[in-house]
């Protein structure tokens, strides 16, 4: 395992250019891990992720790092260099991976609500 997030793990593979994401059944609320698990939550997250990435590619919005879904709760992705400081992107770089996170909720809550209130 290369990285452990709140609800996702990143694993190396035999291919140095490909990583494996494993979505867990853990729950994250207000940026904290809850000790309870939701059965098949990892599978649901993986299927939802794959759906949106495939849709983005089919509609020619942009390319993604998704290679394939290789099991219920896992997918293979292309390894990319994530530049964490915007000023660190070389001006002559032609392909830049922009990390985006989408959180879908029925209503605005948590840290997103606090940011919205601050304007």
Report residues per predicted region:
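Active-site loop/lid in soluble adenylation, ligation, and acyl-transfer enzymes
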Residues: 1-119
């Amino acid at each position: 395992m290369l990285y452990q997030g709140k609800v996702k793990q990143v694993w190396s593979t035999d291919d140095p250019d490909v990583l494996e994401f494993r979505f867990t059944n853990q729950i994250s609320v207000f940026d904290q891990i809850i000790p309870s698990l939701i059965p098949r939550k990892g599978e649901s997250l993986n299927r939802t992720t794959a759906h949106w990435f495939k849709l983005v590619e089919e509609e020619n919005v942009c390319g993604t790092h998704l290679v394939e879904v290789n099991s219920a709760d896992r997918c293979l992705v292309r390894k990319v260099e994530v530049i964490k400081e915007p000023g660190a992107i070389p001006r002559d770089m032609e392909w830049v991976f922009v990390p985006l996170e989408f959180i879908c909720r029925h209503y605005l809550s948590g840290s997103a609500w606090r940011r919205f209130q601050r304007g």
